[in-house]
Curated annotation (Swiss-Prot):
GO terms for cellular component: cytosol. Monomer. HAMAP family: DNApol_IV (MF_01113). The record marks F23 as: Substrate discrimination. It is an enzyme of class 2 (transferase). This is DNA polymerase IV. It comes from Streptococcus pneumoniae serotype 4 (strain ATCC BAA-334 / TIGR4). Mg(2+) binds at D18, D116.
Length: 353
């Protein structure tokens, strides 16, 4: 039995563009000697005492299991021959603006998700081109010819499916999901690949025996809403290719944060501080990717007895600097009166954009 009606707008033409290994690709483009080598954008752990996180990496590095947001130390252990580059975010921002300018030739309905990916609604576009697939190919061609970079594209009738499509064939892929193909495409997909379904939700779905889109299709809406609340409503519709959220050209993020729940309680102050530093670096990475800087740092800490505290500090000037965010987060931690208790969750959020 359906709790809410299924409304599915099949008339829209949505493209999701995702640049391939963007920061690393820009560095390789500007230094051809790096071509074919495992390139990691992030601090070299040999120079930072093991600190730092991976912003992104080339596909050669990914072959060794390196990925975004991994600690630089672990990345080096997996791929000691990698070339580490600290990154030039002003350069990446400049290239990102050039990419945005290419998008605007076709439509003003652009929703940037970060510096290197965006949704485009081309249902009504500036050039009067009826085929969204043709527009996606033209955008890929423009980006390659003008910037010597590759992008993957997904085309469908909503944002969820367009994102799933762009992830399907990387790098430099183009995947189209038509309305009549959506359900079969999603049926064979591992549930962990569903966009917007986080690791904890995946674990809970696995406990319910849900491992694929086909499994998710079999779960009644009432069960999903009972288990997951509002997310259950969305899961039921995503399994059926339904997602009617519009492309928002004025989308504003009010905060950017990272938190982590620890399977093993953190007891040592040294371990807690190390985790806070790592979380700060991940938040800084997200700030760079979103082209944001904030004035307020918020620390969240949940103890082993599940009691939760938050502390915040306002800065004189906006920042996206990892070391400054880390310094403030550690200062907030030092001000806590219950440092002797075990910690099960840490979180750092930046706001005040």
């Amino acid at each position: 039995m359906l709790i809410f009606p299924l409304l599915n707008d099949l008339s829209r033409k949505i493209i999701h563009i995702d640049m391939d290994a963007f920061f690393a690709a820009v560095e390789i483009r500007d230094n051809p000697k790096l071509r074919g080598k495992p390139v990691i954008i992030g601090s070299d752990p040999r120079q930072t005492g093991g600190r730092g996180v991976v912003s992104t990496c080339s596909y050669e590095a990914r072959a060794f299991g390196v990925h975004s947001a991994m600690s630089s130390k672990e990345a080096y252990e997996r791929c000691p021959q990698a070339v580490f580059i600290s990154g030039n975010y002003e350069k990446y921002k400049s290239v990102g603006l050039q990419i945005r300018a290419i998008f605007k030739r076709y439509t003003d309905l652009i929703e940037p998700m970060s510096i290197d990916e965006a949704y485009l609604d081309v249902t009504e576009n500036k050039l009067g081109i009826k085929s969204a697939v043709k527009i996606a190919r033209l955008i890929q061609k423009d980006i390659w010819q003008e910037l010597h970079l590759t992008a993957s594209a997904g085309v469908s009738y909503n944002k969820f499916l367009a994102k799933m499509a762009s992830d399907y064939q990387k790098p430099h892929g183009l995947t189209v999901i038509l309305p009549e193909q959506a359900e079969d495409f999603l049926k064979q997909m591992d549930i962990s690949k569903f966009h917007g379904v986080g690791k904890k939700t995946v674990e809970r779905l696995h406990q319910m025996g849900v491992f694929t889109g086909a499994d998710l299709l079999e779960v009644p809406e009432v069960t999903l809403i009972d288990r997951f609340g509002r997310l259950g409503y969305d899961l039921y519709r995503k399994a059926r290719g339904i997602h009617n959220s519009p492309v928002k050209s004025n989308r504003i993020r009010k905060s950017i944060g990272k938190e982590k729940t620890y399977g093993k309680i953190l007891l040592a102050e040294e371990d807690i501080k190390k985790e806070l530093t790592l979380l700060s670096e991940k938040v800084a990475l997200n700030l760079h990717q979103q082209e944001k800087a904030g004035k307020i740092v918020i620390l969240k800490i949940r103890y082993e007895d599940f009691s939760t505290l938050t502390k915040r500090k306002s800065l004189a000037q906006k920042t996206q600097d990892a070391s400054q965010i880390s310094q403030i987060a550690l200062q907030l931690y030092e001000e806590l009166s219950k440092k002797e208790r075990g910690v099960r969750l840490l979180g750092i959020t930046m706001t005040g954009f």
